[in-house]
Amino acid sequence: MDTSLAEEVQHTAATLQSDSFFFMSPYRSFTTSGCFARFSEPAVGGDDPAGQFQQKLAQAFLNAKTNGIAHPVMVGAIPFDTRKPSSLFIPQRWQTFSRPARQQSARYFSGSQALKVEQRTEIPPQPVFEEMVARAASLTATPQVNKVVLSRLIDIATDKHIDSGALMERLIAQNPASFNFHVPLEDGGVLLGASPELLLRKEGAHFSSLPLAGSARRQPDDVLDREAGNKLLASEKDRHEHDLVTQAMKAILAPRSHHLSMPSSPQLITTPTLWHLATPVEGDARDNENALTLACLLHPTPALSGFPHEAAKELIAELEPFDRELFGGIVGWCDSEGNGEWVVTIRCARLHKNTVRLFAGAGIVPASSPVGEWRETGVKLSTMLNVFGLH
């Protein structure tokens, strides 16, 4: 990798202001400055090209162009529950930068220094989470629900204000192949993360998605690591969980697209800590679709809620002792031409002054083990814990 390129990306992340949006992707990477207008319209109904959300989005783009922003983009985050306000805005300016080579970028970034933790709280505690999983697993064996995704949080209070720009520098170093994001929030906080999961990318008429469901922990030994991946690929439990996601997405996208294609079997992808089952989905959208109509059509996928969605959503509300807010939502951007890219808000943290909230979830099916799901969510949480220098 070119040293000047690595230094450019490092500088971009390290000098990031808390009010800047930053998005790093194989497709388009850019950062913003200034805020022309915030957009808090709930995204419920956002899949309807003629609905209120899309009409207000079009008006926001028109206002930006009228005020001299030639190529406006809408950036930010949409919550898990689309009835809640969105955290979107049109920036005054945005600038693209080259994404560093995936396999070489980390060596150009400085190491991390552990934060001093004043308080750490697991929400819910392990015994309660395992009870939640056991309850959900028993219910997924009934006709009412096939899968539900349950999540947990870690709240951390530190001894000083947390520098989100420095954290982004380390996040990119440790997760160079992820979709890395930094979203400024209206309360002065920041949502940042390293998502492995592409919900929807659209350029022109063509769109793609890469849903993930089913995971296994990476191993330090190369032989054992490959065995872990092969075991995941052969796992009946994980293949079932994954198939629920892909078949639901196929049913949702088919009426709104041309030439929809996906392979019959999943493939393996990796993050620094996990193997995942993944299935690439591609198609051509109908004329009245844009990146956000399709993203809202898919969100939340069964990988984040469960299946069927309404039954899973009710079970999540019953069992989880917190509001997910932006966790399990989507982060990304779209432009006035209908292009855009949205990723699932996982492997992430919400920062505010000296506090951090981390989130991780796991798909529960009849074969799920309560202690196994606690461990799986722990591995997922390690992505962000490592960024903070915590374990």
Residue ranges and their predicted role:
Residues 1-52, 155-161, 165:
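Short Lys/Arg-enriched alpha/beta "domain-start" segment
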Residues 19, 72-78, 148, 180-184, ...:
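A short glycine-rich, hydrophobically flanked beta-strand micro-motif that places a catalytic Asp/Glu
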Residues 23-40, 157-240, 257-260, 338-361:
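An anion-binding catalytic pocket shared by soluble metabolic enzymes
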Residues 32-34, 39-44, 95-127, 133-134, ...:
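Contiguous alpha-helical scaffold segments within structured protein domains
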Residues 49-158, 162-163, 258, 389:
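Non-catalytic accessory segments adjacent to catalytic cores
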Residues 76, 143, 200, 247, ...:
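A residue-level signal for conserved active-site and pocket-lining positions in enzyme catalytic cores
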Residues 153-154, 185-191, 249-251, 266-273, ...:
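A glycine-rich phosphate-binding loop feature that marks nucleotide/adenosyl-phosphate handling sites
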Residues 280-391:
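Conserved hydrophobic core element of enzyme catalytic domains
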